[in-house]
Amino acid sequence: MSETPSKAKASKPAESKAQASDSSGANQYAIVEASGQQFWLQPNRYYDFDRLEGEVGDKVSLKEVLLVSGKAGASLGQPYVKDAVVNLKVLAHRRGPKVIVYKMQKKKKTRRKNGHRQELTRVMVESITVGGKPLS
């Protein structure tokens, strides 16, 4: 069966979109340790961490980078990648959703209800650098 020209034209834009998404940094990421957890971070995206030191607008650097991946390939640290830094900007200090803890002992008339809201910091990933050079 021969392929019609209309089908060939339809597949070309899909390929160009895939290439455009690769060049925009979709495959650039770093896995870092922060707030006792591991996060997968990509440039120009925001994330919520447990409360970090710093005021709104301050710059924060994370040096506990476990893995860095870019166009050149991935670099895995043991335990951390040498000279890798993720630069963040503090956007806001927030509070997470309310979590209700309800404890009850049946037949004892004992009930206890507690609520908790976690203190969070919203940050924007500005850049990922390895050895002083931006990730490419």
Curated annotation (Swiss-Prot):
Keywords, in A-Z order: Ribonucleoprotein, Ribosomal protein, RNA-binding, rRNA-binding
SUPFAM superfamilies per record: L21p-like
GO biological process: translation
Oligomeric form and interacting partners: Part of the 50S ribosomal subunit. Contacts protein L20.
Role according to the record: This protein binds to 23S rRNA in the presence of protein L20.
HAMAP family in alphabetical order: Ribosomal_bL21 (MF_01363)
Entry protein name: Large ribosomal subunit protein bL21
Protein's organism: Synechococcus sp. (strain RCC307)
Protein's gene: rplU
